[in-house]
Amino acid sequence: MPLHMIPQVAHAMVRAAATGRLTLYTKTRTETTNLDHAEYVTCGRYTICAFCLTTLAPHANVKTIQDSHACSRQPNEAIRSLVEVSDKAQIALVGSRTVDYHELDVKAGFVAPTADETVAPSKDIVELPFRTCDLDDSSATACVRNHCQAGHDGVTHLPILSGDFKLPNEHPTKPLDDTHPHDKVLTRCPKTGLLLVHDTHAHATAVVATAATRAILMHDLLTSANVDDGHQARSACYGPTFSNLTFACHSTCASDMAHFDCGQIVGIDLHVEPSD
C-alpha cells in the first residue's frame, strides 16, 4: 500500500467504526459477526486483512479480491477494538472537530460494569478538571501556542493531541462550569492505547476519536507495510508540522506537565499518570 494512503485507510476505518459500518468476512467471503473467524474487514471504501492490516482492495467487494500477501495471522487488538465499537455499539466514538462536553453523556451509551478498568481506580486513570484554552484558531501551530501559553496555573489542561481536535468546550473562549470539576476521568485502553473519557456520575464511557486514535491504527498500518516508523513516515501521516508540533509542546510543557508526557505522542505510546 502506498504510504500516502495510510492516513486515508486509518481515517476511513475509524469513521466506519463510529457509524457501525465495519463488516467482517470469513475466508470463504461469508459475512460474519465473529472476529475470531474473520479474514477480511471492510469499511465501505477499503478492504483490509483482519490480521496484518494489509489493504487488499480500494473497495468493499470482498468476492473479487485475489489476496496473496504474507500474513502473521495474529489477532490485531486495534481492529478488535474498532469492531467492538462498531458491532456491539457499546462505546460511542466522539469525533467531531469540537466536542460538546455536555453531550458526552448522550453520545456515550455504554454503562461500564463496576469491575471495568475504566471505572476501577488505577494508575492509568487521572481526574481532570476540564478547562478550555483560547482555541479560536484551530490550526495545529495555534493549538500548541495557545495551549503552552495557557499559564499552567494548577489547572490540568487536556494535552493537545493533534491540530484537528479541540479541547471539549461550550465556547472556544468560555471556561466550563466547574461545579463538579472532577466528574470526568481520562484513561486509555491498556491493550489498544485508545483514549477513553469516563463519566463518573453517569457511568458512561466514550472513546475519543482524535487523531491519536487514528495514529494507533496508522502505526499498525505502517508496520504492516514494512515502513520505517521514523520522522519521514510520520510526516507523511500527520503532515509536515506534526514533529514540530509535538516537539514544541513537549519542550514548553515538559517541566509543568509531569502528569502527561506530551513527547510520548511522537512514539504513539500514549499514557496517563496520576496527577498530584
UniProtKB/Swiss-Prot annotation:
One Pfam short name: Capsid_VP7
Principal subcellular localization: virion
Keywords (A to Z) from UniProt: Capsid protein, Outer capsid protein, T=13 icosahedral capsid protein, Virion
Keyword match Mitochondrion: no
Keyword Translocase: no
Cellular component terms per the entry's GO annotation: T=13 icosahedral viral capsid; viral outer capsid
Protein's cellular compartments: Virion
Assembly and interaction partners: Interacts with VP4 and VP6.
The family this protein is said to belong to: Belongs to the aquareoviridae outer capsid VP7 protein family.
Function: Interacts with VP4 to form the outer icosahedral capsid with an incomplete T=13 symmetry, about 80 nm in diameter, and consisting of 200 VP4-VP7 trimers.
Record protein name field: Outer capsid protein VP7
